Amino acid sequence: MFLTRTEYDRGVNTFSPEGRLFQVEYAIEAIKLGSTAIGVKTKEGVVLAVEKRITSPLLEPSSVEKIMEIDDHIGCAMSGLIADARTLVEHARVETQNHRFSYGEPMTVESTTQALCDLALRFGEGEEESMSRPFGVSLLIAGHDENGPSLYYTDPSGTFWQCNAKAIGSGSEGADSSLQEQFNKDLSLQEAETIAVSILKQVMEEKVTPNNVDIAKVAPAYHLYTPQEVEAVIARL
């Protein structure tokens, strides 16, 4: 007896006859509703810029975290469900610290991304396994290791790709096409900041201010920009 479409919809571990996992596809669709995040890699390092949606004037802008530090040399920007992102980031932090403790060296950016995606593919661990749904979040992971700067993009299927520049979230289609036009491998870090924020400005529905944009760089150490530093980047546009 064949299951109906709705039964394939509910089962996260069941392939449909066409070979599709609908829950994973829906999670990928959910990210298209999230705030826009942009990553740009240069020879000096990687820049991340993210739109922060401040839904109320009563909200404290600094409490909306869209860029997080994983280790001294790795940071990540997110789009989608922040709680899911936090679960993945906490897992990555533990992995990087365990690696540092065991081997006396920092974990490579690719290995950290792989550890994150392994968890994404298992849909949680320990007691969370009973929840068993895909993580509704996509990440841009920026880092700097012995191989130089790198930028990775992950999605809810547990797949990851290495990119030179990438946009995720609701404005990703327009932002990606702008990145293709403006990106070149000889960009300086300062030019990458300007490009990332100017593209965010195009896709955002409101004026760009230090309250609704976060910027970070990994060059080679992770650094989240202060509101004054963000203001200086915006002033260059």
Swiss-Prot record:
It holds the Pfam family Proteasome. SUPFAM superfamilies: N-terminal nucleophile aminohydrolases (Ntn hydrolases). GO terms for molecular function: RNA nuclease activity; structural constituent of ribosome. The proteasome is a multicatalytic proteinase complex which is characterized by its ability to cleave peptides with Arg, Phe, Tyr, Leu, and Glu adjacent to the leaving group at neutral or slightly basic pH. The proteasome has an ATP-dependent proteolytic activity. The keyword Nucleus applies. Keywords: Acetylation, Cytoplasm, Isopeptide bond, Nucleus, Proteasome, Ubl conjugation. One of its GO terms (cellular component) is nucleus. Gene3D superfamilies: Glutamine Phosphoribosylpyrophosphate, subunit 1, domain 1. Signal peptide: none annotated. There is a cross-link at residues 43, 66 (Glycyl lysine isopeptide (Lys-Gly) (interchain with G-Cter in ubiquitin)). It is found in: Cytoplasm; Nucleus. This is Proteasome subunit alpha type-5-A. It comes from Arabidopsis thaliana (Mouse-ear cress). The keyword Cytoplasm applies. GO terms for biological process: proteasome-mediated ubiquitin-dependent protein catabolic process. The gene is PAE1. The modification N-acetylmethionine is found at residue 1. The lineage of its organism: Eukaryota, Viridiplantae, Streptophyta, Embryophyta, Tracheophyta. Component of the 20S core complex of the 26S proteasome. The 26S proteasome is composed of a core protease (CP), known as the 20S proteasome, capped at one or both ends by the 19S regulatory particle (RP/PA700). The 20S proteasome core is composed of 28 subunits that are arranged in four stacked rings, resulting in a barrel-shaped structure. The two end rings are each formed by seven alpha subunits, and the two central rings are each formed by seven beta subunits. The catalytic chamber with the active sites is on the inside of the barrel. Belongs to the peptidase T1A family.
